[in-house]
Amino acid sequence: MSHRKYEAPRHGHLGFLPRKRAASIRGRVKAFPKDDKSKPVALTSFLGYKAGMTTIVRDLDRPGSKFHKREIVEAVSVVDTPPMVVVGVVGYIETPRGLRSLTTVWAEHLSDEIKRRFYKNWYKSKKKAFTKYSAKYAQDGAAIERELARIKKYASVVRVLAHTQVRKTPLVQKKAHLAEIQLNGGSVSEKVDWAREHFEKTVSVDSVFEQNEMIDVIAVTKGHGFEGVTHRWGTKKLPRKTHRGLRKVACIGAWHPAHVMWTVARAGQNGYHHRTSINHKVYRIGKGGDEGNAATEFDRTKKTITPMGGFVHYGAVNNDFVMVKGSIPGTRKRVVTLRKSLYTSTSRRALEEVNLKWIDTASKFGKGRFQTPAEKHAFMGTLKKDL
């Protein structure tokens, strides 16, 4: 420790304390984009499931850069986004202490995958959730229309209740994820009418986001359990001959105050934290029924976004998907929340038009030599297992 500096930056950021396990596995949207009444009514966020990552090649369109008009290789994340089902609408009124919920109106029919969300043990339950509520529709629906009229009259913020269709994914889970999504654009009356028209109907991801848009990804990070202080906070390892361990903090504070300060790095829970990763550029929004949703103008090969053998620990992506630049929080199969950006980005990276030249669909488990089964068959010929 010779030539030790008297000052050094602290290790680890204090802005994300406490570093504890998230209360819910679903990413919570704590702020929505500012409403613009001149635009048409639309959702501001969407739920999907992280499938995995792959590689793309594109030409950089950035005048002045030494890589302008040259090929670059980038990592992208693929989010499986089956259409969401709208099942309710919530009205909020403004108070001196913030927004307060006015009332909630649910749809008449709810699927079993969303009813499971209201039970801890579905098989032992009587499965009578919302039976009394749906009876209001049988009684000419006057009570429902009164609640919708209250929202139109008093509410200033309108949000819809929508759930995922988890049965369309490779996940074993049967319980859908429910989210409250704010409606932006149009008047309050138009928002309520939009929500009422979409009751029990699906909304696709391409109606929320578009290509080249900058979005935010909200999710719970990958958990690592109880970790030591060196890995958790990035503190420096002590010299080799240190007594009773090297991966520790040598001094955890002064004699007085006679307690350990909250700013001192300590061992504890690492990972499984709620995080918001901002400014991910949308490279592609693919359709699930398109057998060539991974083809480009440069690569005309008819192939899907699912790599050979499927995404590792996930499987095949047969629904609509969103491809965003870089890595996103969470592990595979984890539900992630995609949200419109809270502000308009004016950087060159945000305004750049992205045209993909090639998408890697080789196996993510082995060497990844072939892009399609047809290419493998043409090279290997007929194998003994195929006879």
From Swiss-Prot:
Per its record, what are the GO molecular function terms?
A: RNA binding; structural constituent of ribosome
Q: What Pfam families does the entry give?
A: Ribosomal_L3 (PF00297)
**InterPro entries referenced in this protein's UniProt entry, alphabetically:** L3_arc_euk, Ribosomal_L3_dom_3_arc_sf, Ribosomal_uL3, Ribosomal_uL3_CS, Transl_B-barrel_sf
What keywords is this UniProt entry annotated with? Answer: Cytoplasm, Ribonucleoprotein, Ribosomal protein
Q: Can you say where in the cell this protein is located? A: Cytoplasm
| Biological process, per Gene Ontology | maintenance of translational fidelity; ribosomal large subunit assembly; rRNA processing; translation; translational elongation
- GO CC terms, sorted: cytosolic large ribosomal subunit
Which family does the similarity line name? Answer: Belongs to the universal ribosomal protein uL3 family.
Please state what the protein is called.
Large ribosomal subunit protein uL3
Question: What organism is recorded for this protein?
Answer: Eremothecium gossypii (strain ATCC 10895 / CBS 109.51 / FGSC 9923 / NRRL Y-1056)
- Gene name linked to the record: RPL3
